[in-house]
């Protein structure tokens, strides 16, 4: 590849700030993410923060939201919106100790409406935290060595890793590398400590980078947009590695972790009214040994840092940089920065992106139990005090917890002699109810959406369980109750629940209206395609009745629902993301 080919640099970091989007100026002039956040927190007149600080606080893992259920009523009463904040914990690989769980339980009860939310990127979210509770909440996290740094914003977000780290030595090794990757890619500014822990500014952090900033890698303007990293261990693709900006697929040789296939340019966010936006699956470009992992992370991220679009944020993700510049050019530039060529990708096989629920024994003889947590919502339901039950398990459990990328929870590292005690708590609190659920429900996932997400156009978490209850009679009619089919719902097209790789997906368009997609790959290897646009519940159920019935009658042995939807002609196969909207 000829690296001397001229590429368009009119929209990247090489340009003056006044030629770029306003967020670039905001970041550059933010004093390394400090802004006036401290002053906004101290303002007693409003429940909100300054709009500029609201953007900067995302780098601190915090989103300003409001209760949309009462937004119109408060507007009629000429009151400010009911503002609160969501704080997202940085938890690489989803690993959580029992002491950390108990602290999060305490914070959820004190500051977040008696609930916790497990996310699709293996972490916790605390919703409805009031402005004056943010510092106490984040300082509480610090007590158990947790924080919310870089959980949002134009940085690396949370680093994912296939669970369960204790099932095998390879899983443990991959988790350790994912945790190191999270620290390696973390921004270095002291803003977080100063604002949330109220520490004095450390003079040693100033001018540690060539541009005089505190960020040797990121500089003053950080990344063009979010950048997601994930580690998958075949045959499980639970992290949806093809949906990551940078994915590492573990390659095992003679029972040991040898290295990783490198996949770049995944990302599922899109906008319905902007056809230039589309989901894209990551492209596998080669293989690196474990010893080259962090060098590879730096090389790939630096290409996006330097060449990503900083004019149009709808076009700023790495997937667009790759499609604009060309995959061959991007790969060659990565290799130039590495100083060596990537080896050919090694063979691997994925079989599923779902969670095996129930009990499994690890190589060391210890047990692990995966619990179904519907849509990741940890809360006390009538007849099923889930939050209380998990708190009780945390009190008696001697191992750890693992949050899965499907918003479920693993009680991990249970010694054989301790299993009866765990089973007793599970039975007492109804935590084993997943054993009677349909496979469709067990393979479902929804984003939070209303009432707290400002981007949601329709319900998601609060609606999907009810919709599944109306689909389940169809499954029973056609003998498909035990057939694993992935279904995912989001309240908008941005894709937080990774809907565009599901076999059935619904994305919100307006209250009660959704786009219906079919044909995603069972293990996340293929994008789905729109089947119906902007339809309500009755049309969704009628469509699924037709397709599920056809599937039950004419499927071939071992054929998955998504594969059938394409073979039967309900939707066309999407070969590349750029053709998703065709």
Swiss-Prot record:
A Gene Ontology BP annotation from the UniProt entry: sulfate assimilation
EC number(s) from the headed UniProt entry: 1.8.1.2
This protein's pathway: Sulfur metabolism; hydrogen sulfide biosynthesis; hydrogen sulfide from sulfite (NADPH route): step 1/1
CC terms in the record's Gene Ontology section: sulfite reductase complex (NADPH)
Reactions that this protein is recorded to catalyse: hydrogen sulfide + 3 NADP(+) + 3 H2O = sulfite + 3 NADPH + 4 H(+)
Segments for region (Disordered): 1-26
UniProt KW keywords: 4Fe-4S, Amino-acid biosynthesis, Cysteine biosynthesis, Heme, Iron, Iron-sulfur, Metal-binding, NADP, Oxidoreductase
Name of this protein: Sulfite reductase [NADPH] hemoprotein beta-component
Gene: cysI
């Amino acid at each position: 590849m000829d690296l001397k080919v001229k590429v368009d640099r009119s929209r990247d970091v090489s340009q003056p700030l006044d030629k770029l989007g306003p967020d670039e100026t905001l970041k550059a002039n933010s004093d390394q993410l400090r802004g006036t956040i401290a002053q906004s927190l101290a303002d007693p007149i409003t429940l909100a923060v300054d709009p500029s600080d609201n953007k900067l606080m995302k780098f601190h893992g915090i989103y300003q939201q409001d209760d949309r259920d009462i937004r119109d009523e408060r507007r009629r009463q000429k009151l400010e919106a009911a503002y609160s904040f969501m704080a997202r914990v940085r938890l690489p690989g989803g690993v959580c100790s029992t002491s950390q769980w108990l602290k999060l339980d305490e914070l959820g009860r004190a500051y977040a409406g008696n609930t916790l939310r497990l996310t699709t990127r293996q972490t916790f979210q605390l919703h409805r935290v009031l402005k004056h509770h943010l510092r106490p909440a984040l300082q509480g996290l610090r007590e158990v060595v947790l924080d919310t740094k870089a959980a949002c914003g134009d940085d690396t977000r949370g680093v994912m890793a296939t669970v369960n780290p204790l099932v095998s030595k390879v899983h443990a090794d991959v988790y350790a590398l994912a945790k190191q990757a999270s620290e390696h890619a973390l921004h270095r500014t002291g803003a977080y400590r100063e604002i949330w822990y109220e520490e004095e500014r450390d003079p040693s952090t100033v001018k540690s980078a060539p541009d005089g900033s505190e960020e040797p890698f990121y500089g003053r303007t950080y990344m063009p947009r979010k950048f997601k990293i994930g580690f998958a261990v075949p045959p499980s693709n639970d992290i949806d590695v093809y949906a990551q900006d940078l994915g590492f697929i573990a390659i095992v040789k003679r029972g040991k972790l040898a290295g990783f296939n490198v996949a770049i340019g995944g990302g599922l966010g899109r906008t319905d009214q902007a056809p230039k936006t589309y989901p894209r699956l990551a492209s596998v470009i080669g293989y690196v040994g474990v010893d080259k992992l962090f060098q590879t992370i730096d090389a790939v991220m630096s290409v996006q840092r330097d060449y990503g679009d900083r004019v149009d944020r709808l076009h700023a993700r790495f997937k667009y940089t790759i499609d604009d510049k060309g995959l061959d050019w991007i790969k060659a530039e990565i290799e130039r920065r590495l100083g060596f060529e990537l080896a050919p990708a090694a063979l691997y096989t994925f079989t599923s992106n779902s969670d095996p629920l129930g009990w499994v024994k690890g190589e060391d003889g210890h047990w692990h139990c995966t619990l179904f947590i519907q849509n990741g919502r940890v809360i006390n339901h009538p007849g099923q005090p889930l939050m209380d039950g998990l708190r009780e398990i945390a009190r008696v459990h001697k191992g750890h917890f693992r949050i899965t990328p499907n918003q479920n929870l693993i009680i991990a590292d249970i010694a054989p002699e301790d299993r009866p005690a765990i089973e007793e708590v599970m039975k007492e609190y109804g935590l084993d109810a997943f054993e009677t659920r349909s496979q469709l429900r067990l393979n479902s996932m929804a984003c939070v959406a209303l009432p707290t997400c400002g981007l949601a156009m329709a319900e998601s978490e609060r609606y999907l369980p009810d919709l599944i209850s109306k689909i389940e009679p169809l499954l029973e009619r056609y003998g498909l109750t035990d057939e694993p089919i992935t279904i995912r719902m989001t309240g908008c097209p941005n894709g937080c629940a990774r809907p565009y790789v599901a076999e059935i997906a619904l994305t919100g368009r307006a209250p009660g209206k959704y786009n219906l997609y079919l044909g995603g790959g069972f293990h996340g290897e293929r994008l789905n395609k729109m089947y119906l646009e902007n339809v309500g519940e009755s049309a969704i159920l009628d469509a699924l009745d037709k397709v599920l019935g056809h599937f039950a009658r004419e499927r071939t042995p071992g054929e998955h629902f998504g594969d059938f939807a394409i073979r039967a002609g309900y939707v066309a196969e999407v070969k590349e993301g750029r053709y998703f909207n065709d």
